[in-house]
Amino acid sequence: MPWWWVHAAVLAGAYLLGSIPFSYLVARLGGVDVRTVGSGNVGATNVLRSVGKRAGAVAFALDFAKGALATWLAMKTVGGAAFPSAAALVAVLGHMHPVWLRFRGGKGVATGAGAFLPLAPAATLGGMLSFAVVAFATRYASLGSIVGAFMLGVLAFLFGALPPIPWAATAAAVLIAWKHRENIRRLLAGTERRMGASP
């Protein structure tokens, strides 16, 4: 098989893995269409709020795992840093724009964390810690998600990850921030819903 076919197949696989709407499927098992409740976002946070903590944790774990698997397969199949970084980014895009849900997906936070864990484990854990600190200090999951995403990119630079990785992580953070643009508007207006608040 020509090398470019391998690259194309791996990227297509990364997109399709990212596209698997685990949050939607987990919520459906609980009898809920997550697209029609809460924020309407197909992500673990909305599953947690709309279905329950256990369902939210399962959705997060599966979204995280599919990102990690997409990157791991690229690392094992092609190797290097550039191509797996691209696969990580494609997996995030797959989650945000899944073919199975007419390209209306989630915001990419859990999938992004999973996708960059094999490439930059320390930076990813630092980003996740940043999310936890900000989210629990402010009770804004959206703010924690945005800060955590950008901190992953910053820490990847600071920890000396191979050059494509920090740039890909930063690109993913920009995409995640864009998907949170309505949350950002509400944060600025003081109307964003806090964690644990009633709908």
Task: Walk through the language-model features, giving the residues of each.
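Hydrophobic alpha-helical transmembrane segments
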Residues: 4-12, 56-57, 61, 84-89, ...
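Interfacial segments of multi-pass membrane proteins
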Residues: 48-51, 74-77, 90, 94, ...
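Helix-adjacent hinge/juxtasegments
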Residues: 69-109
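C-terminal binding/interaction regions
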Residues: 162-172, 183, 194
